[in-house]
From Swiss-Prot:
InterPro entries: Ribosomal_uL16, Ribosomal_uL16_bact-type, Ribosomal_uL16_CS, Ribosomal_uL16_dom, Ribosomal_uL16_sf. This is Large ribosomal subunit protein uL16. Belongs to the universal ribosomal protein uL16 family. It comes from the Bacteria. One of its GO terms (cellular component) is cytosolic large ribosomal subunit. Pfam families: Ribosomal_L16. Binds 23S rRNA and is also seen to make contacts with the A and possibly P site tRNAs. GO terms for biological process: translation.
Length: 136
C-alpha cells in the first residue's frame, strides 16, 4: 500500500479540501482517468483500482498512478471517551479536487483503456471521466 516513508509530523489537522486541482493534463500516457468530483482516496482504494486496471489490460502497456496518499487519518478506538488526545493513525488518504488526473495508461487500444478505467472507477468513491492526451 502507498504511504510516505517518513514525515515531518505524525498527525495533521483535518483541514479543508477546497480549491482547484494541479495535474489536470495527461502527461505520461495517452489515456487518463480524471476526477470530476471532490473527495479523498485512501491508499486501499488507489491500490484496488490499480489492480483492477492491471488485470483488465492483462499486464500489457504501462500504468501511471498520479496521486499519492500523503495525509494521515487518525481514529480513536471503539468505546473510548472523548478527550485524552488525538487518536492513532489508521490510514492514509490523498485529497482530490475536480480536474485531477488520477491514473494514466499507454500501450493499449482506446477500447481496452476505456474498459480498464471503467473497472477502476467502480472502485473509487468519486465521479471520474475518461480523457485522452491533447496534442498541441
Amino acid at each position: 500500500m502507498l504511504q510516505p516513508k517518513r514525515t515531518k509530523f505524525r498527525k495533521v489537522h483535518k483541514g479543508r479540501n477546497r480549491g482547484i486541482a494541479a495535474g489536470t493534463d495527461v502527461s505520461f500516457g495517452t489515456y487518463g482517468l480524471k476526477a470530476i468530483g471532490r473527495g479523498r482516496l485512501t491508499a486501499r482504494q488507489i491500490e484496488a483500482a490499480r489492480r483492477a486496471m492491471t488485470r483488465a489490460v492483462k499486464r500489457q502497456g504501462k500504468i501511471w498512478i498520479r496521486v499519492f496518499p500523503d495525509k494521515p487519518i487518525t481514529e480513536k478506538p471503539l468505546e473510548v471517551r472523548m478527550g485524552k488526545g488525538k487518536g492513532n493513525v489508521e490510514y492514509w488518504v490523498a485529497l482530490i479536487q475536480p480536474g485531477k488526473v488520477l491514473y494514466e495508461m499507454d500501450g493499449v487500444s482506446e477500447e481496452i483503456a476505456r474498459e480498464a478505467f471503467a473497472l477502476a472507477a467502480a472502485k473509487l468513491p468519486i465521479k471520474t471521466t475518461f480523457v485522452t492526451k491533447t496534442v498541441m
